Amino acid sequence: MFGVYVTHPQVQIDPDVPVPQWGLSTVGRERAVITAALPWVRSLGRIVSSDETKAIETAQLLADAAGVTVEVHHDMGENDRSATGFLPPPEFEKAADWFFANPTESFKGWERAIDAQARISDAVFRILEDHDPKIPIAFVGHGGVGTLLKCRLTGAPISRAADQKGGGGGNVFAFRLADRAVACDWTPMEHWQGI
């Protein structure tokens, strides 16, 4: 069976609200609702989410369609960027480029990419240790740590080249549960048809 990593789609950006508390925007919610109607979502037997609002909202829409309960896991959160707080999109993109290009260093107090990769990978692998590989599972989280997890699963060095395209999130990559081999690269969530 398959595992899928789902990044939350577009969020309601509010510089006055801590980033982990941002919720989905209207567009993001619409994309998640469209995705929830797809057959692969109904086949999910387990959904595990980051504890950030936007991820939980996405996971809940998928879980409602699958008829399962969302499990929340703190260690699946996005890389810790609280040291800088909100950065306007152009500044954030430059910072993200630096984050991926310098994985052993911290960008102005951010969690280092190597540490975020170890955290997300350890969380996912711990969950999979006790998971029945015959049951499809979704991990719902964030683009940065999702990319770091994908690099770990493929054995590739940390690189923004492995990041989701298009901006705004709302993508999936899938991997086989039997051997954890990545089976498809980032695909818009509402376009992915399963494996």
Short names for language-model regions:
Residues 33-97, 101-104:
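Phosphate-coordination/substrate-recognition cap region in phosphate-metabolizing enzymes
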Residues 5, 10-16, 93-107:
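Short, basic/glycine-rich phosphate-binding loops at helix/coil junctions
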Residues 40-43, 127-136:
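Glycine-rich phosphate-binding loop signature in dinucleotide/nucleotide-binding domains
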Residues 99-131:
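Internal catalytic-core helix/loop-beta-alpha segment
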Residues 2-57, 61, 111-120:
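Loop-to-helix element that buttresses phosphate recognition and phosphoryl-transfer chemistry
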Residues 3, 135-143:
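Generic beta-sheet signal
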Residues 10, 143-144:
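Alpha-helix/helix-capping structural signal
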Residues 68-72, 78-90, 133-135, 151-195:
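Acidic, low-complexity terminal tails and accessory targeting/binding regions
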